[in-house]
Amino acid sequence: MQALSQQAVRILRLFGDQESQRVLLSVGAEQEYFIVDRERYLKRRDLIYTGRTLFGAPAPKGQELEDQYFGVIRERVGEFMADLNTELWKMGITATTQHNEVAPAQHESAPIYSTCNVAVDQNQLTMETMKRVATRHGLVCLLHEKPFAGVNGSGKHNNWSLNSDTGENLLDPGTTPNDNLQFLLVLSCVIKAVDRHADLLRMSAACPGNDQRLGADEAPPAIISIFLGNQLSDVVNQIVENGTAAGCIEGGRLDTGVSTLPVIDQDATDRNRTSPFAFTGNKFEFRMVGSSESIANSNTVISTIVAEAFCEAADVLEKSENFERDVNLLIAENMRNHRRVLFNGNGYSEEWRQEAARRGLPNLPNMVSAIPALTEEKTVEMFEKFGVFTKAELESRSEVLYETYAKTTAIEARTMLHMAGKHYIPAVVRYTARLADSICKVRSACPEAGTGVQERLLKETGELLAQASEAQKCLEEAVEKMNNIDNVREMATFCRDGIVPAMRALRTPIDRLELIVDKAIWPVPTYGDLRVEVGYLLLIKTFRPKISEGKKVRKETVTVSFRVQ
């Protein structure tokens, strides 16, 4: 933050601001999370050990109807949210909004913006408080990036802007951004910073859980790009082609045609939720950060890479003899050299992946692929130049990240083996035995009666059981091999290339078996059980009936309750 402030003040001085002494990074983190019933949670060892479900077939109803997002908040969840807000405000955390998110049982909480370091600490407190308050309500708050397959995962949108201590927002384009040279210079520096350090920015959001979320047609892709919207994209195109922008697209007015309703002003910008780094009015929104992670890493990277771009711009312009000419030239140069990172289209599409490859943009689909960016020469030079990290500190962090990935994956693999061996396979064996017994009894009782259904189920179940057993054996061998690797980077790489595919191979047949095996036999709550509307214990009536015991009359208080599903 200090490095960013120093370089941003240099930019302000170039435009005649002699009053501002500091520029602060203002941050607001939108925290997403899932809420499940604690009673059901305790029956899922994968949720307890890893924070996510390692097995689970899709529920009949997911998020297809799009009826969860901003829908009515369920009463029990609403009481949890109200209690959470009270606890947060007691600590000075200004929680201001809460709503349902896209997936069933998914929600969001967001605070009022704070200075970056304060926002980071408050977000850590928020996550801890969420878990504590949820327990108080008989619930569990899941902060994992992908607790359930097949529906949206959870992220943490990191909204950030640059504000001087005199109250000026450096990212406010004004009504005519084409004439706002200070804003255009700041914008061009951000574009330059993100393009030059896209791999480092991707690394800042890398965590094992995000490997399950990013690029899954629900969250930002693993490819870093910037969305500017129609208005600013038009200004950038004019600058790239002509050196300056003569005008800009203006917002329109929406006339509903109803005399009793006012005419509505339309914003000149638009939204693109498929972009990982989007300009939204007067701020940028970095959407890659995982829901369980601290926002410190991403904001440290953003602050430093933007500070570097500001420093280079100030070095050039402070020597200028014709400031207006040179600032226009520098803005055009930055935008021309780094426009490849600008993209307003669908970030989920395969066409974008192909286009990004043609543009030379890095595509780092997993954590292990992203970690090396932390120790690249350009990264080390930048962090050391601004006194943020030394080379030794970056190498240490790199080792910790590799170790974290390897240990997390190993825990998930061992949990899968435990659940498969102790829960799923024994349950399926009991089911096949029941089918076989049914076939024998039907044939004995009535040879003419058909047993085709039982035989088909037995055959299909037996085949899937064999696949699961073989996959279990392969995963056991992979885990044993992993245990013999000493180098943490090699171990993490093996986990990505060997353990994770073996885990998928074990999950596939067991998820299919879940759709076949009798629910009474299935050993754990299903996705439908976990994500159904969180039950609410309703007190119906408390009464004191008289119970006769011979000549004596005893009074007892009886509470009748039921759980709404």
Per-range role (PLM):
Residues 1-143, 152-155, 162-399:
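Glycine-rich, acidic/polar active-site loops that bind/position phosphate-bearing ligands
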Residues 147:
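Glycine-rich N-terminal segment of FAD-binding domains in flavoprotein oxidoreductases
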Residues 165, 442-443, 545:
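Short regulatory "switch" loops immediately downstream of catalytic or recognition motifs
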Residues 286, 534, 541-543:
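Generic low-complexity, intrinsically disordered sequence content enriched
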Residues 337-537:
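C-terminal amphipathic alpha-helical interaction region
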Residues 542-565:
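Intrinsically disordered, low-complexity segments enriched in serine/proline and basic residues
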